[in-house]
């Protein structure tokens, strides 16, 4: 990535690539202190945030050798996409993914210009200092306060129907509702661990494959053919590419306070779905 500070050590330097960002193997700091950043630069400062990630954020290990989830990775990817396309991420996603697929309740910025999502469909999240919960605003403070809701790490609002169409596109070689959003080769690349990334990383391009974050998959879905991802507030998606099954859980753990855990819940639901699939295909209980 031109102009991006590399990893340096006594053995020399290693450049960070787009693949490292997508697989969370870049070694870049997981997050930043939002309060300190806002005090220094102010709110709604996406350009300052990108410069911080490029020049100042810590590089913690040699890229491609370990997994460490980082919101900064996907904000860097957002900056690259916006530079290449000349569009904001929220607009590009709407014009090239959400609207072509007919997703009428999916998008960024329900509270903002030209909202496409009615606030009555937005679940409230954490109570704020003034006593009211966030509703229709992305929960993640970095995405909300520094990126203004248009952010690569968080901020898409959707419903189960909309997400099911996206899952169908992924399972069908990039096509759903008669519209192609990605090529079959792109889907193949994004659903497996890259060959040049250490196997212990366990991440596909944008998706979890078998890393330490693959708990939502449970114990029964096939490791080699299943990808998954979670959202910080609680939602999760599991996609079994081989058996063409998608599990979408839309619930959250941060209302009224950020104290809940859904780790066990997700795994149990995944096991129930996977075992029922085995029962229907084999004619006998799967567990």
Predicted regions: what they are:
Residues 7, 176, 256-260:
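A generic structural signal for short coil/turn motifs at secondary-structure boundaries
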Residues 8-224:
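Short, surface-exposed loop or secondary-structure junction motifs
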Residues 1-5:
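Acidic helix-start/capping segments at beta-turn-to-alpha-helix junctions
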Residues 229-287:
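Structured C-terminal helix/loop/strand segments within mature extracytoplasmic catalytic/sensor domains
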């Amino acid at each position: 990535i031109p102009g991006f500070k590399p990893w340096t050590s006594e053995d020399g330097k290693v450049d960070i690539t787009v693949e490292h960002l997508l697989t969370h193997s870049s070694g870049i700091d997981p997050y930043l202190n939002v309060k300190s950043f806002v005090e220094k630069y102010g709110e709604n400062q996406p350009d300052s945030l990108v410069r911080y990630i490029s020049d100042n954020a810590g590089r913690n290990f040699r890229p491609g050798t370990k997994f460490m989830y980082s919101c900064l990775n996907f904000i860097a990817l957002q900056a690259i996409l916006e530079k290449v396309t000349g569009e904001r991420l929220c607009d590009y996603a709407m014009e090239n993914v959400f609207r072509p697929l007919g997703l009428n309740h999916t998008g960024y910025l329900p509270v903002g210009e030209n909202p496409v999502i009615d606030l009555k469909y937005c679940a409230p999240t954490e109570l704020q200092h003034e006593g009211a919960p966030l509703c229709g605003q992305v929960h993640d403070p970095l995405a909300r306060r520094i990126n203004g809701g248009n952010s690569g790490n968080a901020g898409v609002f959707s419903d189960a129907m909309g997400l099911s169409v996206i899952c169908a596109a992924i399972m069908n070689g990039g096509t759903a509702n008669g519209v192609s959003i990605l090529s079959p080769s792109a889907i193949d690349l994004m659903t497996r661990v890259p060959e040049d990334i250490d196997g212990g990383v366990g991440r596909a391009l944008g998706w979890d494959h078998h890393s330490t974050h693959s708990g939502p998959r449970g114990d029964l879905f096939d490791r080699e053919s299943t990808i998954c991802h979670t959202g910080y507030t609680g939602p999760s998606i599991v996609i079994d590419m081989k058996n063409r099954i998608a599990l979408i859980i839309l619930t959250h753990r941060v209302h009224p306070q950020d104290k809940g855990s859904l780790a066990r819940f997700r795994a149990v639901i995944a096991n129930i779905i996977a075992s029922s699939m085995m029962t229907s295909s084999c004619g006998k209980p799967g567990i």
